[in-house]
Amino acid sequence: VIGGDECNINEHPFLVALHTARXXRFYCAGTLINQEWVLTAARCDRXXXXXILGVHSKXXXXXXXXXXXXXXXXXXXXXXTYTRWDKDIMLIRLKRXXXXXXXXXXXXXXXXXXXXXXXXXIMGWGTITTTKVTYPDVPHCADINMFDYSVCQKXXXKLPEKSRTLCAGILQGGIDSCKGISGGPLICNGEIQGIVSYGK
């Protein structure tokens, strides 16, 4: 997250860190949507990944953090068909149901789409500097606004006329998602409205 601040430790009980199983390296984020499923981006598909729930600082292992092995990943269609603006969505089923605790709880799924101009938050352990990659130990949060899709379409000429992607950000720039935050949630009014796919 560029231009954000450290998230409050109580602010993200649904935020999941995805690690590569072998190198135990953090590479993506996800959102716990119930005791058995984590919602993330299709680009975060890895052969063997471990989902870590209830983690705040990557440096200090809290007793509350629980590592869960993934049982199966379900992508929207043949995983090869996702693009930066379509079907970049995946569900990871946990091998065993996660016990809800203060540090790990599910995010409410959105009942209705967020209106343009609504304020939402993005969060994750992605890089916090643009010139070089600087991964923080604790997740960063940033407030951004929802926009009409046409606003993003004007900014990124490659976007198709119709898309299932949401458009969000800050028009004056300076606040954005960045490398390593993919798969993390877009939260509006405490509900998950989207999944971070890419920032520009």
UniProtKB/Swiss-Prot annotation:
Keywords noted in UniProt: Disulfide bond, Glycoprotein, Hemostasis impairing toxin, Secreted, Toxin
Record-annotated site: Forms a covalent bond with the inhibitor PMSF: 182
Tissue expression remark: Expressed by the venom gland.
Recorded GO MF terms: serine-type endopeptidase activity; toxin activity
Family as reported in the entry's similarity comment: Belongs to the peptidase S1 family. Snake venom subfamily.
Function: Snake venom serine protease active on several blood coagulation enzymes. It completely cleaves fibrinogen Aalpha chain (FGA) after 120 minutes, partially cleaves Bbeta chain (FGB) (overnight) and has no activity on gamma chain. It does not release fibrinopeptides A and/or B exclusively, since the enzyme does not provoke fibrin polymerisation. It also degrades fibrin as efficiently as plasmin, and exhibits potent ability to cleave plasminogen and prothrombin, as well as heavy chain of factor X (F10). In vitro, it cleaves insulin B-chain (at positions His38-Leu39, Ala40-Leu41 and Tyr16-Leu17).
Name of the protein described by the UniProt record: Snake venom serine protease VaSP1
Organism of provenance: Vipera ammodytes ammodytes
